[in-house]
């Protein structure tokens, strides 16, 4: 697949599942995120989102409006972003950056009461930290322990 011109975000649907299940993630990335096939069973308040490049799934993440959000912010209008991944075969094409740049307008249209997105990124995951900073997320100064070490809590105001 050539580098796509049109990037959009959409709610995961049944038609996306076969491609999402085949995503390839190298071991050095799997330690920091979950494979999309591990997120097939979502609970109320979790919204699986697909990054589409010219209509083809290339990325995935989950937006949460669950009690879990309170672990990261006291803002009752915030959402939590987790498990961002880009299929390894589609990496280095700008899809993560462009998908995250589309996040604000997607949330404003689909979740109009949301005014903040928070996330936690492992302190060793420098590429992800740089991505989030490039698209406008800021380090809140809060720290938490994750499964493999310290995580930085970042946010973006919408």
Regions found by a protein language model. Name each.
Residues 94, 111-112, 136:
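Short glycine-rich hinge loops at helix-strand junctions in the catalytic core
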Residues 64, 118-120, 140:
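Solvent-exposed beta-strand sheet faces enriched in polar/charged residues
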Residues 113-129, 145-150, 155-158:
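Conserved beta-strand-loop-alpha-helix junction that forms the acyl-donor binding cleft
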Residues 97, 123-141:
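Conserved active-site alpha-helix within GNAT-family acetyltransferase domains
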Residues 2-7, 11-83, 87-89, 101, ...:
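Acetyl-CoA-dependent GNAT
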Residues 92-100:
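Glycine-rich acyl-CoA binding loop
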Residues 87-89, 93, 123-124:
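Active-site acidic-Proline motif in GNAT/NAT acetyltransferases
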